[in-house]
């Protein structure tokens, strides 16, 4: 491989970290100050809604950061409002799927974004919105760029499922998206593609997308002209907390803040992946960025009086054991009876299995008609570290088992059993496999929050015959060149460690209908329209 190609790949990989929400440098210490005139509520007399989405924010480390005085802005908003430590995320617990749920108010069966990595039966290829460097070096870099930046929002995200930006536009209201990886709206924008990518002749110099009225996306689109300082390579091309904060503050200071602003702070996720879920540095940096946004109002008191603040995580993380051999569960040896497709070449007619690993969960596809999903499940059951193994039959029943057990649990939507969110189900078999308890036809969830609806969402998220598998806490699933986080943190599974996130609400006494990310969109629309 020539040096020029190596440099290009390195740069493209840097841009692909946009989706992963990885670490960027940010040396500025941000302190509370009163330097700008206060901003009042919008022309209709209603408070604008500002959503701060902090990647991999979790309750326990947040509480610890507050106790140590390292998160004063979040502490201030918490003290001025409401705090909910355990809000249920989407599944898989990967940012692209969760953000699609946040924006559409649906699970993956309706929004059709299955995970960070999945296989398209229609295109006969893997879809990667970004992933580890080893994995990415084996695939088409420019295709990953196109999938992550364009296809995700304009093609893969179900057009029949409206985003919050689209619904607001339909009502004549405005919104903003700042560094959010899912942003589809109704206003056309031209994303400026870096020259080293546009020169490939496969990617246009300007990429036309639809988003909200105000769209900011790292080096590809900025609101604040001075924010170029935060877009160099070593700052992940602008996919960092400081960039997000500066663009949000710019809207406030210029009195252009729309009805709803969704701002994404990515850096905590990478620090949690590397240092483990108990690290506090990422929370401290996110809080410093939040201070920048609050300061744009002149004072924090003015900020709370003149806006509704929603600060939340998207997924949790589970600590990964620090011994590589013990911590990783390689799926390939379990399925060595089959011909498994290779990452670095197109799927061949003789291939039988495709593996799409998403950290602590994976989709395992049977792409050959002679492969029975039930046989794939039996081979997977030989690994006792596998937590949930699920497949769907021809009648849309979902069957669940796990490693080293002969137990089986089956279910489908509709029926006499009602869960704590008002959803109805038909159940049979060993309920302890999904840790639910049933009493008088009422379902209570255990360590897998909202497991029936979330798993059903993934099992019906896209075309194809596939098995969904998750791994127990402490472990990660790997396929060919999958990224690992040995001694750090990982997410992706249905387990509560991956699935529960905190929510801070300030500026309103209301809350979502249920404490699930899937219900936050409708609540925000109510706040804007009431």
Task: Tell me what each language-model feature is.
Residues 160-161, 350-511, 517, 521:
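Active-site neighborhoods of enzymes that stabilize oxyanions during catalysis
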Residues 24-82, 93:
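Active-site-proximal N-terminal segment of extracellular/periplasmic enzymes that hydrolyze or transfer
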Residues 238-252, 259-261, 268-309, 319, ...:
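A long, amphipathic alpha-helix that forms part
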């Amino acid at each position: 491989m020539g040096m020029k190609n190596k440099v290009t790949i390195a740069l493209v990989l840097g841009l692909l970290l946009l989706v992963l929400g990885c670490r960027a440098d940010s040396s500025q210490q941000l302190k509370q100050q009163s330097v700008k005139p206060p901003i009042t509520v919008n022309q209709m007399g209603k408070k604008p809604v500002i959503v701060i989405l902090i990647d991999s924010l979790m309750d326990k480390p947040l509480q610890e950061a507050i106790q140590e005085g390292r998160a004063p802005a979040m502490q201030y908003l918490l003290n001025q409002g409401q705090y909910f430590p355990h809000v249920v995320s989407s599944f898989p617990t990967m940012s692209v799927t969760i953000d699609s749920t946040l924006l559409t108010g649906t699970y993956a069966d309706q929004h059709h974004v299955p995970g960070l990595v999945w296989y398209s039966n229609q295109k006969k290829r893997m879809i990667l919105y970004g992933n580890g460097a080893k994995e990415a070096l084996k695939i088409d870099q420019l295709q990953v760029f196109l999938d992550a930046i364009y296809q995700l929002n304009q093609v893969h995200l179900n057009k029949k499922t409206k985003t919050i930006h689209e619904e607001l536009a339909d009502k004549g209201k405005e919104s903003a998206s700042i560094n959010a990886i899912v942003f589809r709206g109704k206003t056309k924008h031209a994303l400026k593609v870096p020259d080293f990518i546009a020169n490939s002749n496969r990617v246009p110099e300007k990429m036309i997308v639809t988003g909200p009225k105000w769209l900011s996306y790292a080096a590809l689109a900025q609101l604040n002209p001075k924010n170029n300082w935060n877009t160099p390579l070593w700052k992940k091309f602008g996919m960092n907390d400081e960039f997000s904060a500066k663009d949000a503050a710019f809207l406030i200071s210029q009195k252009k803040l729309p009805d709803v602003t969704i701002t994404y702070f990515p850096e905590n996720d990478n620090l949690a992946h590397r240092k483990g879920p108990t690290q506090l540095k990422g929370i401290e940096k996110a809080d410093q960025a939040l201070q920048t946004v609050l300061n744009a109002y002149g004072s924090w008191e003015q900020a709370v009086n003149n806006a509704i603040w929603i600060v939340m995580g998207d997924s949790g993380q589970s600590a990964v054991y620090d011994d590589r051999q013990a911590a990783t569960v390689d799926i390939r040896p379990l399925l060595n009876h089959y011909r498994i497709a290779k990452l670095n070449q197109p799927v061949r007619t003789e291939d039988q299995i495709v593996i799409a690993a998403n950290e602590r969960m994976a989709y395992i596809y049977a792409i050959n008609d002679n492969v029975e999903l039930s046989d794939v499940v039996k081979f997977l059951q030989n690994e006792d570290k596998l937590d949930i193994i699920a497949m769907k039959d021809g009648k849309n029943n979902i069957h669940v088992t796990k490693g080293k057990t002969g137990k089986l649990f089956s279910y489908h939507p509709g029926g006499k059993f009602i869960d704590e969110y008002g959803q109805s189900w038909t159940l049979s078999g060993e309920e302890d496999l999904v840790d639910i308890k049933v009493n008088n036809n009422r379902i209570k969830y255990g360590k897998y929050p909202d497991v029936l609806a979330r798993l059903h969402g993934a099992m019906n998220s896209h075309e194809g015959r596939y098995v969904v598998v998750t791994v127990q806490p402490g472990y990660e699933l790997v396929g060919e060149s999958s990224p690992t986080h040995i001694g750090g943190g990982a997410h992706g599974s249905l387990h509560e460690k991956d699935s529960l996130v905190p929510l801070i609400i300030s500026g309103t006494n209301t809350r979502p209908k249920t404490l699930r990310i899937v219900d936050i969109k409708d609540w925000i629309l109510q706040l804007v329209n009431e």
